Amino acid sequence: MRHRPSAKGTVRLVGRLEFSAVTEGAPRITDEYRIQVDIANPLDRALPQVFEVGGRIPREGGYHVNPDGSLCLGSMLRQRLILGAQPSLVDYVDKCVVPFLYGHSLRESGTTAFPFGELAHGVAGLIDDYCLIFGVSDEDGLRRLMWLLAMKRRRANKLRCICGCGRRFAACKLHRKAHAARRTLSRLDIKRACQEIWPSN
């Protein structure tokens, strides 16, 4: 891939991405796409934007393309968890971009579509995915849990758990699942995710 001129402060890489991928229940596919990767911040602060620029993927929501033309590679927190605490651009491409493109190639071939699962569009999809990540069942529980996780840990641990068990957050089993995610996710990640879903809060 080559570096191309871009907006001030953004690193833009454009070129062909070749890959060979396979998953259980679907065939191996070797393919290539022309993509553009815009990196505005270090990976530990913000995820890159990725665009398919060869004209193969329609710029429509049904193909998991955002209104600005970038590929919807999954929720922000899910991508963060996939990448781990020390993300690299190579990991980002291998673990987030290639699975998306592999899914599209399967769709083109008529075999199947997005074997790794699909989120609903917009806020509804984010809520569904974050409920799975944190082990809560509805939006209200998610909002209250993410509010706790956005606090300093010492303060949040002393408050009552949002599940209604009557225990302090630190003593509840919900705490263990939530803080397993927090080993990778920062408070800034949580706050940004909250703003995506509830921008007025």
Task: State what each model feature region is.
Residues 2-92:
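Compact alpha/beta protein-protein interaction domains typified by the UBC
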